[in-house]
């Protein structure tokens, strides 16, 4: 591959080629795009890699017939610069399969080409997928999504088999037998039993949840993709994975913006800092996602 900026300038010689030493890199330096490490336990534990499908892998399963690895996760579009260009479309929820059948699928095909959806269509989206499990025949895969509070059923290649099934707040864990799917709703502390034939919840078992009310209420603002995005598929946690980070850099400036004066005293009682805050510049430049853990009082 080549290292090209968004103006079409090729920097490969300076990144990985003969001039790489100028930036402290060895010739041949590269960034790997490995989504999964595949360990062959029948062949001296040899390790191979598959990738190129997504930025963050959030769940993995193995197809019961072919042995193909299948992953679910998030593909982020951080290569697109500037907030007005992105217009809120900065990530996609995906399923990828490698091996005998290779495919990469957008699990929300109804969102393609649009920046906003009415509530009824938004409810069909899945966001922040966390668990995937195949049926014993391999014809179905069930996907539990933490941000959209639902379960989606797809075929072996990731194509939807109907609309998502609402199951509970924070759907994180999943297990199947031939008759039902068991879904752990982490945020509300319940286990939902879903009838696989009827595609609806048949029973809910409450679990003990010691988390304080303040944390439970805050989870909706952090994770809920239907509540806080125009297409129903992203939330704060799309980039701040589990309140941490996606380890990506984003250039979210606004070339058409203006300086925003900050008229407060920011020296915190230290004269060397000066009396004023620096004004906010509309061009932030590339900035890496920061963790939100220990944000208050630490």
Model-flagged regions — what are they?
Residues 4-28, 32-35, 39, 43-298:
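Periplasmic c-type cytochrome electron-transfer domains
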């Amino acid at each position: 591959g080549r290292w090209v900026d968004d103006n079409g300038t090729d920097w490969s010689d300076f990144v990985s080629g003969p001039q790489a030493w100028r930036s402290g890199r060895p010739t041949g330096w590269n960034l790997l795009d490995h989504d999964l490490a595949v360990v062959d336990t029948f062949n001296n534990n040899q390790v191979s890699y598959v990738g190129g499908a997504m930025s963050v892998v959030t769940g993995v399963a193995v197809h019961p017939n072919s042995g193909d690895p299948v992953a679910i996760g998030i593909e982020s579009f951080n290569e697109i610069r500037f907030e007005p260009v992105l217009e809120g479309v900065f990530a996609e929820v995906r399923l990828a399969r490698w091996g005998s059948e290779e495919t990469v699928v957008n699990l929300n095909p109804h969102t393609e080409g649009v920046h906003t959806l009415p509530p009824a269509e938004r409810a069909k989206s899945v966001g922040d997928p966390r668990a995937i499990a195949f049926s014993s025949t391999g014809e179905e895969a069930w996907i539990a999504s933490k941000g959209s509070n639902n379960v989606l059923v797809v075929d072996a290649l990731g194509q939807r088999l109907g609309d998502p099934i609402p199951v509970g707040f924070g759907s994180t864990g999943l297990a199947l037998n031939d008759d039902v799917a068991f879904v752990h709703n982490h945020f509300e502390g319940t286990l939902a039993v879903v009838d696989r034939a009827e595609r609806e919840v048949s029973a809910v078992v409450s679990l003990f949840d010691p988390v304080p009310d303040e944390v439970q209420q805050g989870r909706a603002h952090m994770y809920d993709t239907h509540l806080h995005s125009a297409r129903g598929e992203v939330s704060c946690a799309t980039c701040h994975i589990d309140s941490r980070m996606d380890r990506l850099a984003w250039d979210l400036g606004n070339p058409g913006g203006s300086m925003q004066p900050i008229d407060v005293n920011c020296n915190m009682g230290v004269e060397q800092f000066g009396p004023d805050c620096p004004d906010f510049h509309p061009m932030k430049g590339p900035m890496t996602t920061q963790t939100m853990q220990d944000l208050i009082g630490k």
